[in-house]
């Protein structure tokens, strides 16, 4: 397996063990490791990364830190960098060159880093196994009158807050459109205000369903 031959299809690789981490970094002299956590910060951070992967050749290994703890610990030990999630590290010849984590994974931070990463000959896309069907089901139930405004808001915000999927930036932005950043509401869900205060909720939900496809 070589970086030149397989860069197009080997974009996103699960790293479940320390051995897989070592093999991945050996196979790909220039590569990134993304540690995925258990909340929407992971979804947001990966969405930012995904926008750069569309235009740049950078294989990414991802670690779900709760499920694959030995792999995560191995990365922390080999780099000497304190673990965070989400966390993005870029390696060259097995040595970490760059690290950023949590809400600091932003376009402004990544842009100068990716200026040093080879560009793709054509725009690419990152395929993941995550889907948006749970959101679709909840939204359909709301539009069909099976769920009240308040219950829908409660369930949707909870689902979004706990969503650690590796999503595209487009999906993240669409899903966050209804109620914004749930981190603003840790003092209690009542701080969200009335479900209808951003406009007719059912109309906005139906529009979102249409855009999600």
Residue ranges and their predicted role:
Residues 34, 57-74:
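Thiol-based oxidoreductase modules, predominantly thioredoxin-like and allied folds used
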Residues 14, 51, 66-70, 117-123, ...:
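Terminal leader/tail segments of proteins
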Residues 43-46, 72-73, 103:
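Conserved strand-to-helix beginnings and helix N-cap segments that scaffold or border functional pockets
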Residues 78-82, 131:
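Short loop/turn motifs at secondary-structure junctions and domain boundaries
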Residues 19-56:
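Local sequence-structure signature of Cys/Sec-based thiol-disulfide redox active-site neighborhoods
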Residues 1-29:
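N-terminal leader/targeting and pre-domain segments
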Residues 84, 89-123:
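Non-catalytic, surface beta->alpha helical segment in thiol-disulfide oxidoreductase systems
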Residues 20-21, 107-213:
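Acidic, Ser/Pro/Thr-rich low-complexity regulatory regions
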């Amino acid at each position: 397996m070589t970086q030149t031959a397989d860069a197009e299809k080997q974009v996103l690789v699960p790293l479940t063990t320390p051995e897989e981490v070592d093999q991945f970094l050996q196979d790909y002299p220039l590569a990134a490791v993304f540690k995925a956590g258990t909340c929407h910060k992971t979804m947001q951070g990966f969405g930012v990364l995904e926008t750069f992967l569309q235009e740049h050749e950078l294989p990414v290994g991802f670690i779900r830190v709760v499920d694959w703890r030995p792999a995560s610990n191995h990365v922390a030990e080999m780099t000497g960098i304190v673990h965070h999630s989400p966390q993005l590290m870029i390696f060259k010849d097995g040595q970490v060159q760059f690290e950023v984590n949590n809400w600091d994974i932003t376009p402004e931070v990544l842009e100068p880093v990716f200026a040093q990463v080879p560009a793709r000959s054509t725009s690419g896309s990152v395929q993941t196994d995550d889907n948006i069907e749970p959101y679709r089901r909840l939204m359909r139930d709301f539009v069909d009158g099976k769920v009240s405004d308040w219950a829908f808001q409660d369930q949707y915000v909870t689902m979004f807050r706990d969503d650690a999927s590796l999503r595209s930036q487009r999906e993240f932005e669409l899903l966050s459109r209804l109620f914004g950043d749930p981190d603003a509401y840790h003092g209690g869900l009542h701080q969200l205000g009335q479900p209808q205060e951003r406009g007719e909720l059912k109309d906005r939900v139906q529009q979102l369903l249409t855009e999600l496809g």
